[in-house]
Amino acid sequence: MAKVYHDTEVSLEALKDKIVTIIGYGSQGRAHALNLRDSGIKVIVAVRPNGESWKRALEEGMTVEKIEDAVQKSDVLMFLIPDTEQPTIYKEKVLPYLRPNQALGFAHGFNIHFSQIVPPPFLDVFMVAPKGPGPLVRDLYVEGKGVPALFAVYQDYTQKCRDIALAYAKGIGATRAGVLETTFKEETETDLFGEQVVLCGGVTALIKAGFETLVEAGYQPEVAYYECLHEMKLIVDLINQGGISFMRKAISDTAKYGDITRGPRIVNEETKKEMRKILNEIQSGQFAKEWILENQVGRPVFNALLKKDEDHLIEKVGKVLREMMPWLKPKK
């Protein structure tokens, strides 16, 4: 089992008298910046001058600088902008101003693991990846709690990088819940696999396939939507709360029997073979190369596939049905 580090085992000492720059002030950036500040760490927010993030950070009492200025003043730099934007920002606004003994931090390992960012050898490089959205990271911190996180050290020039990573995790409240040590390779590959095969790709493909099967068999699209999409949250919430066995205790015996006898016919050995193929594409770097190239040519496949799914019947039906559910606060 992985070693879990808790609040009492970790000190903020490694960040004492250091300046931490948070690059980005979106969902995660704002949460990290505010939590670190409230933990007594000196924080600079680095964003595009006079944009919405700049204005919001100022309104919330943060010290705000242009990225290139903040880099020169800081000891620790945390990248909390989208993965696709990081390499250009790093090359143009960070790399020219780096100095020995600084630390680069990331919340996801993609750009380091797939060499889109290659840091000079005189830096520490670490990762702290909260396992929850930014607003939750902030809200739980304010309540005296925390969101669990992963941490990793990629490059330890000062021989203090591990302490810096753990101190950072403590500063955002993660050690209150517990942090697990991993590697950039493990975090990146498992994160991509989970997104593609289960959490996003797998779930959405399963929902659409079930919906289409019922509609093609003559059932009303509205009923198919309820059975294949809307009720998904009920089951996922139970699994999230207590695991698969806990969920099964909360459903009918009929549902339970159908689950354990029919589920394996849907996700079978052929499905797992395809899962292993996708994992290999991630491990070999094939997916990363494909996604990087897709961005370089303007995302034609990405945009076309998104548009196709946005025009799917399930979206049209869902929009109508969600208007009947005011508690969902339907959004465009």
UniProtKB/Swiss-Prot annotation:
Cysteine pairs bridged by disulfides in the record: none
NCBIfam families: ilvC, PRK05479.1, PRK13403.1
Cofactor: Mg(2+)
UniProt family annotation: Belongs to the ketol-acid reductoisomerase family.
One GO cellular component term: cytosol
Record-given protein name: Ketol-acid reductoisomerase (NADP(+))
Residues annotated as binding substrate: 252
GO BP terms in the entry: isoleucine biosynthetic process; L-valine biosynthetic process
Enzyme Commission identifier(s): 1.1.1.86
Binding annotation for Mg(2+) 2: 191, 227, 231
Task performed by this protein: Involved in the biosynthesis of branched-chain amino acids (BCAA). Catalyzes an alkyl-migration followed by a ketol-acid reduction of (S)-2-acetolactate (S2AL) to yield (R)-2,3-dihydroxy-isovalerate. In the isomerase reaction, S2AL is rearranged via a Mg-dependent methyl migration to produce 3-hydroxy-3-methyl-2-ketobutyrate (HMKB). In the reductase reaction, this 2-ketoacid undergoes a metal-dependent reduction by NADPH to yield (R)-2,3-dihydroxy-isovalerate.
Cofactor note: Binds 2 magnesium ions per subunit.
Record domain KARI C-terminal knotted: where: 183-328
Keywords, alphabetical: Amino-acid biosynthesis, Branched-chain amino acid biosynthesis, Magnesium, Metal-binding, NADP, Oxidoreductase
Domain called KARI N-terminal Rossmann: residue spans: 2-182
UniProt catalytic activity: (2R)-2,3-dihydroxy-3-methylbutanoate + NADP(+) = (2S)-2-acetolactate + NADPH + H(+); (2R,3R)-2,3-dihydroxy-3-methylpentanoate + NADP(+) = (S)-2-ethyl-2-hydroxy-3-oxobutanoate + NADPH + H(+)
Chain sites annotated for binding NADP(+): 25-28, 48, 53, 83-86, 134
Recorded superkingdom: Bacteria
Enzyme active site: 108
Residues binding Mg(2+) 1, per UniProt: 191, 195
A GO MF label: magnesium ion binding
PROSITE patterns: KARI_C (PS51851), KARI_N (PS51850)
Organism: Dictyoglomus turgidum (strain DSM 6724 / Z-1310)
One Pfam family, short name: KARI_C
InterPro entries the UniProt entry points to: 6-PGluconate_DH-like_C_sf, KARI, KARI_C, KARI_N, KARI_prok, NAD(P)-bd_dom_sf
Pathway assigned in UniProt: Amino-acid biosynthesis; L-isoleucine biosynthesis; L-isoleucine from 2-oxobutanoate: step 2/4; Amino-acid biosynthesis; L-valine biosynthesis; L-valine from pyruvate: step 2/4
